[in-house]
Amino acid sequence: MLGEKPATLYSWKRRDRWDETEPVDRVALSMEAQLIRLVVKEKKEGRDFKEIDLLTRQLDRLRARPANDAKVSDSGSAVGSRRSRRADERNAFSDEQIEKLNDAFLESIFDYQRTWYRAGFKERIRNILKSRQIGATWYFAREALLDALNTGRNQIFLSASKAQAHVFRQYIVQFAKDAVDVELKGDPIVLPNGATLYFLGTNARTAQSYHGNLYFDEYFWVPRFQELRKVASGMAIHDQWRQTYFSTPSSLAHDAYPFWSGKLFNRGRPKDQHVSIDISHAALAAGRSCQDGQWRQIVTVEDAVRGGCNSGARPLFNLDRLRLEYSPEEYANLLLCQFIDDSLSVFPLTVLQPCMVDTWDVWDDFKPLYLRPFGDEEVWIGYDPSHTGDSAGCVVIAPPKCPGGTFRVLERFQWHGLDFEAQAAQIEALTRRYRVTYIGIDTTGIGQGVYQLVTKFFPAATPFHYSVEIKTALVMKAQNVIRKGRLEFDAGWNDLAASFMAIKKTITPSGLQVTYKASRSEEASHGDLAWACMHALANEPLEGATATNTGFMEIF
């Protein structure tokens, strides 16, 4: 109607304190505007002079009111002089900086992200199934910051773990710093206009008092999703709040799938109220408001390319190369938003979910930002070397402190394009960061070269030259540990979970034996991280630590 951007109107509203203006002040402003119009009128009539006199007297009377409202100035106009950022105010932005942020945001987003932006103005619930690495977390972090600055609404970021939720915070802090040189501080981040940005993991079950716009990241990888969604949606139950769910697909068996498919809406409702939602890519590629009140969209990597992410000086994706690097199954799951049928997996998602914990809450002895994150406690390293066309996987595991205790995956790494010398150098760097007492390495192929170099600085490294028997022993040990609830890793590490899910039972070429395999690619989550983890777990005997297979030596 006015031809102005929403961000400009929000800036006027905030600068002139429209929400703080009382009815009597609005009357004074209207009278002033009418008085100005009459004064500048060239040919005045008698009634114009009468109205000028009346308006002048009325404005004088309003000025004589008790000075309990400082919004009207001596001239009768509303206070609203342009405010500048106060140097002593934490996390403060001037109006000019907010406008610059808005411009930087709109100039940086792609067409498919612009679709999310438009949907955010009119849809209460956005539900997006997406390809990996298309900038969803990056986009929603920026969107939320601007919404908080423009409207004063709280923003709640919920992820499988607090570490994952803090990825939002990193994007927000970086955006403010790069665009307008404002350094945001605090956790949560509190803005001068009262808006608060919360970053939560699964401990949000105890945070029901929070309220604001909800952003739920990678919800298809969160354990006990239905339980958590009830709490999370309650934070945004007021009509002014919006809810945004976005994730890469996991398993058809995950309890978030009915929420995506619309089957959850039908539960407990009479049959005549049931809805049938078309969740095919053809139906949802452009975004669609569905019968259950959700706005859904599927964005594949090919949609992202069509949406402009390859239009810059540095294209994000080379689809031809990706089709070579990934198997058809991997390409469909990672990039075309197709769900995994893990019914044939040795490690289905339902078995892995109890292992996924919010490490920032439950591990108080691990400090990932320290030079020595685990102090002088011992760790084991498992390594799956890079073969032609795939990535190298490495995990650092804290072994149990007592027999039958829990293994904790402290860190996991993915290294691309490194030769065997560079891979060995990465392992050596870890031995300086941790007190390493065991290293297990696959010595098949290039792994032999890595192993030879590792033994120069860690002579006790254990080799695994793959055979049917060795693979079977590794998988059996991992199954035993996982099914007994003895493995923990960060709930935000869906790449590690997917890596285990990719391992399946198969038949050897001779048809005489059963073995295990996982597709290999440059994506760490498909096989290599799981095998690396199993190399470390194998340091404990299959039957566990017992009196007959453990001992100690005391030196006098």
Predicted features and spans:
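Pre-P-loop entry segment of helicase/translocase ATPase cores
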Residues: S11-R14, D19-I125, T196
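C-terminal nuclease/phosphodiesterase catalytic domains that cleave nucleic-acid phosphodiester bonds
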Residues: A64-G80, Q226, V346, V395, ...
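Walker A/P-loop
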Residues: E123-E143
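Conserved Walker A/P-loop ATP-binding site and its immediately adjacent core
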Residues: G152-I172
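Inter-Walker segment of RecA-like/P-loop motor cores
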Residues: H166-G212
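ASCE P-loop NTPase helicase motor core
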Residues: A176-K185, I189-P192, P223-N318, T431-R432, ...
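Nucleic-acid-processing active sites and adjacent nucleic-acid-binding tracks
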Residues: L191, V299, D364-D365, L369-R372, ...
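ATPase catalytic-site recognition across NTP-hydrolyzing enzymes
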Residues: R288-Y383
